[in-house]
Amino acid sequence: MAMVTDGIDPMSLKHDEADSKENITFKDFYPGAIATIKDVKRWKNSKHAEQWTSTIETYAVPILGQLRVKDITRGDILEVLKPIWTEKPETASRLRGRLESLFSQAIAEELIQTNPATWKDGLAFFLPPISKVHEVKHHEAMPLEILKSFAPETAKKTSVVSRAVLFGILTATRVQEFLCARWDEIDIQRATWTIPASRMKCGLEHRVPLSRQALAVLERCERKSELVFPAPRSDKEMVIDSPRAFIRKATGESFTMHGFRSTFRDWCEENFIHEALAERALAHVKGDKVVQAYQRSDLLEQRRPLMQSWADTIMPKKK
């Protein structure tokens, strides 16, 4: 009655609220949905909500953010998942599950009638099972438990290629990035390695915080060349297949340097490392050139404890 007295039509207000709810975008919907799911499921670990939010913000919002929840289709979900389904199967699988939960919440709130992120009778017709993806990736990504033995054993070797491989693992960098590392790119005092844009896949300069273990590798390297890891019998760059050959000889398996980056990424995921830090550590820059230009902070200092923790995990201090 008070609203009528104030000149407000309650029926009109109710209609406006319903219209606003019906037209809600994914970007406006998902924070509240995550909060509701958190409360209903009584999550005890606050990091679960942070991880959900981080994953959704990184992978889903750029594509789904401005779409109305009711307009999102299976095709939109596939656009989100396909780019990472084989490259980051663990992340992709978790993301799909989280999206399915969010859209189930949307159904419960009567925003939609069908769930575009369901697996059975839905996405399963367009994406291979994660188990099959893992079978392929298993041959290239060394499991963490094996890496915990491989890294310390590699540290005992004295060849240039063994040091290059270990440095690459500790810094989670690509083969062409660490094989061509030069001494003038490395600041020992600041424990920072600056890779020039010309050698980066993303075309942007990348600063890498160096852990104690990574610095120890550099201390054992001879400075006979401008290159940190020159070819054994020359001052030229090492053959790009040298690390793979070394790993195969040492393990008898077809593990690759790229696989170590996958192992690092899975470790980040399992330890609730914020998505932005993990992606920056791997020099995965999102968005077009304009978006990249506005991402001024490379989170160097925030990444420093991350890389030290990674190094301590695979090469713990001797007691």
PLM regions with names:
Residues 23-26, 54, 65, 70, ...:
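Extended, non-catalytic subsegments within catalytic or DNA/protein-binding/adaptor domains
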Residues 141-148, 190, 199, 209-259, ...:
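Active-site/catalytic core of tyrosine-dependent DNA strand-transfer enzymes
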Residues 22, 26, 30, 45-48, ...:
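Hydrophobic (often cysteine-bearing) scaffold residues that line and stabilize catalytic clefts
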Residues 5-12, 22-86, 102-105:
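Basic/aromatic-enriched alpha-helical hairpins
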Residues 185-192, 254, 273-293, 316-319:
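Short, polar N-cap/turn motifs at the start of nucleic acid-interacting alpha helices
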Residues 194-203, 215, 234-235, 282-316:
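Catalytic-site neighborhood detector that most strongly recognizes the C-terminal catalytic loop/helix
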Residues 19, 40, 84-100, 108-175, ...:
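Basic, Lys/Arg- and aromatic-enriched nucleic-acid-binding interface segment
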